[in-house]
From Swiss-Prot:
It comes from Acinetobacter baumannii (strain ATCC 17978 / DSM 105126 / CIP 53.77 / LMG 1025 / NCDC KC755 / 5377). GO terms for cellular component: cytosol. The active site is at K116. Belongs to the NAD-dependent DNA ligase family. LigA subfamily. GO terms for molecular function: DNA binding; DNA ligase (NAD+) activity; metal ion binding. PANTHER family: CHROMOSOME TRANSMISSION FIDELITY FACTOR 18, DNA LIGASE. It holds the Pfam family HHH_2. The gene is ligA. Its EC number is 6.5.1.2. This is DNA ligase. Its cofactor is Mg(2+); Mn(2+). Zn(2+) binds at C411, C414, C429, C435. It catalyses: NAD(+) + (deoxyribonucleotide)n-3'-hydroxyl + 5'-phospho-(deoxyribonucleotide)m = (deoxyribonucleotide)n+m + AMP + beta-nicotinamide D-nucleotide. Keywords: DNA damage, DNA repair, DNA replication, Ligase, Magnesium, Manganese, Metal-binding, NAD, Zinc. The lineage of its organism: Bacteria, Pseudomonadati, Pseudomonadota, Gammaproteobacteria, Moraxellales.
Length: 678
């Protein structure tokens, strides 16, 4: 058979299978029988086996399997994957609507209602219609590259097709990966038959499947992808509503959740909620509520965002599922900052698809409020079907020997005195960095990516080093090279892994003052506050010497945080650890000029492909000068930095008269402020 004829036959089969996949998975209207579909699939596979050099990139047979990975790479989301706010009752729902409508005076508001799928949110990138990347939500800012695994999901298009619409140059689609109930039941039956561990619920099964380093395992699992939104589209799709956007996605080959409703009032939204709640048991997928969105995309833009969630959408959760059990014990756990948290150990009980045996009681005040005692019968429920919580204590079932719970006087880990300042709800161990419980959490935080970024020093290493008494505090990390022979004796730690660890520790010594401050794990000091402190005080010595009043003048530092920072630097054992860290060689570039925040409060946007720097580098330079980097252009945008292939954001900037800067000019501007690529 001629090569051109083979390719033509392959293309015909691929297009035919894609058409039937769309009819089956997206439209839920199969046009051929399973046996006919299998015949087409095997016909294509036979051709590919005969002519492996001609296999097409978008062939459905290439979706399954691949080489196992050693780890997942981190990816920064260009547009953050924000979470949704929650409402749990009609009163909260109506309050959400009031807030929306107050910000949109004299405008008609329609609401798009969708099922809130109980799966894992991911982001898919398509370039010229071809899937190039799949990324987990992660912390909303950074996720993990799971491209090889998402390519194994059968209903997920690898190449976009549409007879009606032009395929965009760049498209980022957000959606949920989950395991339908029927597939979950079959998977568990197969696991049980093989004598292997079963999964507690479909969400756990889906999560476990996506997290497999070997894509062949993911390929064998019955996963499905449901699209729920568009993060980026270049050129702009020109659609005006959420409802139309979802229909547009189906035209491109994506499956969306089986129910969407366009509601003209919030009262109609409530009616749909009650309807969906009744239909929940009959759905093919697990849901934990519904998502309510303002339908008009222009109105969404007007409403904007809070720090972690959009103002134009909320999740309306179903009532939590509850069960009765007994409190067997109440233990006190010590966290990274020394906070003592009471944890109720329960007689294990099955609630909402998972077995619950531990529930946090938050603080001694919550124990007193509930009047919970060891031996009590309690109602346990899962907030939003996720976080277990004690809802109620049943005193009528209380045994005579039930024990009242008191706040311990000394730390259960290091025996240091427990302190609880007047007016605070949380008790703390006063042992600081010498408390073993605080130590392990402090070390985990210290080595994390956004702190000192010591690659390879994970939990297994940390636990082994603590057992061997090689880590008493974070400063000991920088003396591990003195114990090379001991390190080589740790199980599964060979010459290469030990050398890699030592090299990573050495590399981490060159850092920034902001990262170092963040790494110290001072209570109330996150990344942004650490950056503000570094910009304000410029040197560690100046920060250590600062009093509460000086600290309070720092942007992003409130009265309480100022006291926490001052207390940290007044503790002798903390100063001792700091001195040892500096003596070990941790350093950063000295400030070359007084602190400047020339872009303070400005909103900047990055778009297109940057060739001379990464988006992370550009973002860090802007943030160092006080600017905020946004994922969208608005009238409040100060400037747009445009790389190659910039699309809709550039068009919008032109419409609004927002200044646009190319990459070279941006780097020149940054250099003028003392910001250069490192």
């Amino acid at each position: 058979m001629a090569i051109t004829s083979v390719i033509e036959q392959m293309r015909q089969l691929i297009q035919l299978i894609a058409k039937h996949n769309h009819a089956y998975y997206v439209m839920d209207q199969p046009t051929i029988s399973d046996s006919e579909y299998d015949h087409l699939f095997h016909q294509l596979k036979a051709l590919e086996e005969q002519y492996p050099e001609l296999v097409q990139a978008d062939s459905p047979t290439t979706k399954v399997g691949g080489q196992a990975l050693s780890k997942f790479e981190s990816v920064t989301h260009v547009v953050p994957m924000l979470s949704l706010g929650n409402v749990f009752n009609q009163e909260d729902l109506f309050a959400f609507a009031r807030r929306v409508e107050e910000r949109l005076p004299n405008q008609k508001v329609q609401y798009e209602v969708e099922l809130k799928l109980d799966g894992l949110a991911i982001s898919l990138w398509y370039e010229n219609g071809v899937l190039v990347r799949g990324v987990t939500r992660g912390d909303g800012e950074t996720g993990e590259d799971i491209t090889q695994n998402v390519k194994t999901i059968r209903n997920l298009p690898k190449v976009l097709h549409s007879e009606k619409y032009e395929i965009p140059r760049l498209l980022e689609v957000r959606g949920e990966v989950l395991m339908p109930k029927s597939g979950f039941e079959k998977l568990n039956a197969d696991q049980e038959a093989k004598g292997e561990k079963t999964f507690a619920n479909p969400r756990n099964a889906a999560a476990g499947s996506l997290r497999q380093l070997d894509p062949n395992i993911a390929a064998a699992r019955p996963l499905a992808f449901y699209a729920y939104g568009i993060a980026q589209c270049e050129p702009n799709h020109g659609l005006t509503t959420m409802h139309d956007s979802l229909q547009w996605l189906t035209e491109l080959g994506f499956q969306i959740a089986e129910r969407q409703y366009l509601c003209n009032s919030i009262q109609e939204v409530q009616q749909r909620y009650e309807q969906i709640q009744q239909e929940r048991p009959n759905l093919q997928v697990e849901i934990d509520g519904m998502v309510v969105k303002v339908d008009d995309l222009k109105q969404q833009q007007q409403l904007g965002f809070l720090s972690r969630e959009p103002r134009w959408a909320t999740a309306y959760k179903f009532p939590a599922q509850a069960a009765l059990t007994t409190v067997e014990q109440i233990d006190w756990q010590v966290g990274r900052t020394g906070t003592l948290t009471p944890v109720a150990r329960l007689n294990p009980v099955f609630v909402g698809g998972v077995t619950v045996s531990n529930v946090t009681l938050h603080n001694i005040g919550e124990i007193h409020r509930l009047d919970v005692r060891i031996g009590d019968t309690v109602s346990v429920y899962r907030t939003g079907d996720v976080i277990p919580k004690v809802e109620k204590v049943w005193p009528e079932f209380r045994p005579a020997e039930a024990e009242v719970v008191h706040l311990p006087e000394s730390c259960p880990v290091c025996a240091s005195p427990v302190v609880m300042p007047e007016g605070e709800a949380l008790a703390r161990c006063s042992g600081g960095l010498y408390c073993a419980a605080q130590r392990i959490e402090a070390i985990r935080h210290f080595v994390s990516r956004k702190a000192m970024d010591i690659e390879g020093l994970g939990d297994r290493w940390v636990e082994s080093l603590l057992r061997l008494d090689l880590l008493k505090d974070v400063a000991d990390i920088y003396h591990l090279h003195e114990h090379r022979e001991t390190l080589l004796g740790i199980e599964k730690m060979g010459e290469k892994s030990v050398q890699n660890l030592i090299d990573a520790i050495e590399a981490s010594k060159k850092t920034t003052l902001a990262r170092f401050i963040y790494a110290l794990g001072i209570r109330g000091v996150g990344e942004t506050t650490a950056r503000m402190l570094a910009n304000t005080f410029q040197t560690l010595e100046a920060l250590k010497a600062a009093n509460v009043e000086a600290l309070k003048k720092t942007p992003d530092v409130g009265d309480i945080t100022a006291e926490w920072i001052a207390d940290f630097f007044l503790a002798p054992h903390n100063i001792e650890v700091l001195d040892r860290l500096i003596a070990a060689g941790i350093h950063w570039d000295a400030p070359t000029a007084p602190t400047r925040q020339p872009l303070n409060g400005e909103s900047w946007v990055l778009t297109g492909t940057l060739e001379q720097m990464t988006r992370d580098q550009a973002t860090q330079m802007l943030q160092a000068l006080g600017a905020r980097v946004s994922g969208s252009v608005s009238s409040k945008t100060k400037c747009v930095v445009a790389g190659e292939k910039a699309g809709s954001k550039l068009e919008k900037a032109a419409k609004l008269g927002i200044p646009v800067m190319n990459e070279t000019d941006f780097l020149s501007l940054m250099a003028g402020y003392g910001q250069t690529l490192s």
